[in-house]
Structures are given as C-alpha cells and as structure tokens.
Amino acid sequence: MGILNNIFGKKNEKPENKGQHILSMPMFKGDRGYSLDKVIQDLKSYWGLKVDEIEGDDNTATFKIDEELVALALMPAPIPSAEFESIYNYSYLWKDAEKEIQEHTQHAIVSLLGLGSNTSAVERYSLLSKLNASILRTCETAIGIYQGASTLLLPKNLYIDFTDLLLDEDDILPIQLWVYIGIINSDEKSSVYTYGMKEFGKSEIEIIDANMKGSELYDFLLPVLDYVLQQDVTLQHGETIGFTEEQKIKITESKAVFLDGNSLKLEL
C-alpha cells in the first residue's frame, strides 16, 4: 500500500462520524434467541474483550466494552417483510436470502449507543461485527444479520468468516459486512457503486461503464475502500489514485448515477 499512500490524497480533513448510534439486527428461526451469558463469554474468550457493568437478561441487557455502552434487546417478532422487499434481488452474498429470511420468527437489536465514545467509526463497526459474530456463533437458531444502514443482508456462516479478519490487526477489514457494493453489468461494460461509506464520514464511490467485468471491478474497489477506511483517507475531486507509480486514475465528484446526491467517480 506504499504506492497508495503516496498517490492518495490527504488524511481526513472532515470530522468523522464518532459517537453516533449504530445498530444491527440478528435474525433467528425458532422459539429461542441468544443467551446473554454465552454471548458475553464468547466476547471474552474468542475476541479477548473486557466486558463490564453487565445488567439485564436474555431479553434486554446493557454492558460496557472499553468506552462503548452496548445494548441488546430481543424482539419476539420478525422484522416486517416490507423492510426487505426492495433489497432481496441485490443481496448476492446470501444465496437463498428471501426464502430463509421469510422463515425467521424473531430478531434482536444490537446497539452501540455512542455515549461519551470517542473511538473511530472503523473501531465501532469492528466492535459491532464482533458482537454480531458472538451472537451468531453461540446461537443455533441464528440465521444472519440485517445491516439496515447499508441495506445488507448477510448469512450466518459468511458473517462469522468475514469477521475473523478482525483477529489480525494487519489483515484487511471486513468491508463486505459494512458497505454494500452494487454491481451493474450491461453488454461489455460494467459499473460498481458503494452504499454505506457515509457511515464512516466518507463519500460514496462509483465506477461507471468500465471495460471490465463486474467481478473485476469489485476486486479492484475492495482494496481502495479498505485503504480509505484503514488509513482514514479522504479522496478529493481532481486528485488521482493508483496501485503503481504509473497508474493514475482520476477522481471526479459529480451527481451520482446509482445513488442520491453526489459521489466520487473513479475513471477507469
């Protein structure tokens, strides 16, 4: 990433979304939800986290992890189906999403309340992912996660596998759990766009009508997003990026094609 460090723009000059309330919704099939005791034990043993000030039970609970106040609440009803109708067709990471999600019977709300927290959005989403993974790993009836802010539907085993990237501080981030990457294929050209970078105080990114396969664009964009979030970089209109000294990809800010508002375009 040395080349990226030289060619990408400046360190973040805009205030990041610190201390905001973020949440996710694990989904369950059957009569049982998570066990608070098992979740706490997994957070300690698997992730090595210090969990303090635990109050509540399997229905509602709060506790602290470092500076973060965490709240868990089990809701004895499924998430309304209307919430998912517009995103099933785009949920390519969950093969049978519609069928399996329609069978869920209850869900939980996992919240980081952000009260007094000064940790970065990446640190907070990392913690949220660890919480979700601990719930999924310790609960046989859990089927997956709904990350509403990014319109992501994520199946259980995939979620657990991607979260394991957080065990190694030098590894890449589990971007797929935080940011939706839309892939548009048409004739011989493809486009990709992000939805969820705003959660980290960053601009959404689009690559429009590139002479590449959608899968190739996806593979190109992932390390860019990882670098932007890991290094807290703000891409600027008029700059260039590249993975080699010779590669200079122009960055342009303009009205988004697949999103509301503006986006940054990488011109391949």
Where are these regions (language model features)?
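Short amphipathic alpha-helical segments
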Residues: 35, 120-131, 213-220
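Short, extreme N-terminal segment that most often corresponds to the first beta-strand
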Residues: 2-55, 257, 261-268
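Structural alpha-beta junctions
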Residues: 45-52, 130-145, 227-235
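N-terminal low-complexity, intrinsically disordered segments
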Residues: 29-100
